[in-house]
Amino acid sequence: MSALMNTYARANIDIVRGEGCWLYDQDGRDYLDLAAGVAVNTLGHGDPRLVQALKTQADILWHASNLYRLPAQEALATKLTDATFADRVFFANSGAEAVEAAIKTARRWQGAKGRPERYRVLTFGNAFHGRTLATISATDQMKVREGFTPLYDAFDTTPFNDIEGAARAITPQTAAILVEPIQGEGGLTPATPGFLAGLRALCDQHDLLLILDEVQTGIGRTGHLFAHELYGVRPDIIAVAKGLGGGFPIGACLATEDAASGMTPGSHGSTYGGNPLACAVASAVLDAVLAPGFLETVRERAALVDALLERLLRRHSDLFVRAQGHGLMRGLQVRASARDVVAHLRDFGVMTVAAGADVVRLLPPLTISELEIAEAEARLLRAAEAWLPIAA
């Protein structure tokens, strides 16, 4: 029996090795990885640039403390601010921690402005922001809230993509609006074209901060460095993680100078956040993603995946309903349990991940090749053709 806490319904396979877009189990069987560790393995498995960055840094310094300046941390922060709207960065170890830092930054900002009564954060139905007590308080998804009540009474939830509902939900106690540009766990549902712009306008009107949770959408996943670029909207704060480390744990809260003005010494901290190993690897990830032509290639690969999904929907409308999402962050709505379909696809050598009850996520490494996309289509078709007798 495993000594691990039973917090995951783990598949009965041991993944022992990864290379590029492929995973291998204990029996040597290969799996085309269209999950990428849930949008984490930006450059696939074992990318030599990341391996070298980690080895080089490991020979120099693993950990000191955030009580000192750390060159690897300063270098990564500068790369992030040079490439984005942000002026300041706080480093953490995960997406949930990055969102926590974003919430604290917004509340601290309101307090520094002399408005401590503004502490509530407006969030949206079917959102997912992490599994800490604060971040599960920020969602209405009962599957992550169950058993943890009473939760923090600091969030107000309104329907996603309903700008009029958001306007009505703002009160004199509202400090900020927290939203995913594309809901990840919520079924790969994108914000409608005017929704994020409408939220930006509401924040400007009511002197609130706009926080974007780009934990899953960031670092090139949509074909842009961050998904808010698709919408032409400038946030005040974003939470980043997953793809930033390419498989090495790191999170970050990025903010404008004004939004970060309340974060003074002692207001927040992290023992391991921004450690040299994580920052060295994340710097190598950013160098690759920001290299000329990389994001253009991601968009080209995304177009091939779109065409693949259209063919799949035409040939197997008995199983697949529709596709949604952007770039290499795609969701397939299915006429069955998403978890059952994910298990079935795994039997045919394709790794995917569920999003809610009836959506299967396709989140391949951004380095997936045209040949691998063709192989993905072949395996998905074989799996879909074999589904009928199972469902009958």
UniProtKB/Swiss-Prot annotation:
Entry binding sites for pyridoxal 5'-phosphate: G95, A96, F128, D213, E214, V215, Q216, T271
Where in or outside the cell it occurs: the entry states: Cytoplasm
Write down any Gene Ontology CC term: cytoplasm
Name a biological process GO annotation. Answer: L-arginine biosynthetic process
Q: Where are residues bearing N6-(pyridoxal phosphate)lysine located in the sequence?
A: K242
Q: What is its main location?
A: cytoplasm
PROSITE patterns given in the database record:
AA_TRANSFER_CLASS_3
Q: Does the keyword Ribonucleoprotein apply?
A: no
Which coenzyme or cofactor does it need? pyridoxal 5'-phosphate
What EC number is given for this enzyme?
A: 2.6.1.11
Q: Which reaction does it catalyse?
A: N(2)-acetyl-L-ornithine + 2-oxoglutarate = N-acetyl-L-glutamate 5-semialdehyde + L-glutamate
Q: Signal peptide location in the record?
A: none
Its subunit composition reads: Homodimer.
What is the name of this protein?
A: Acetylornithine aminotransferase 1
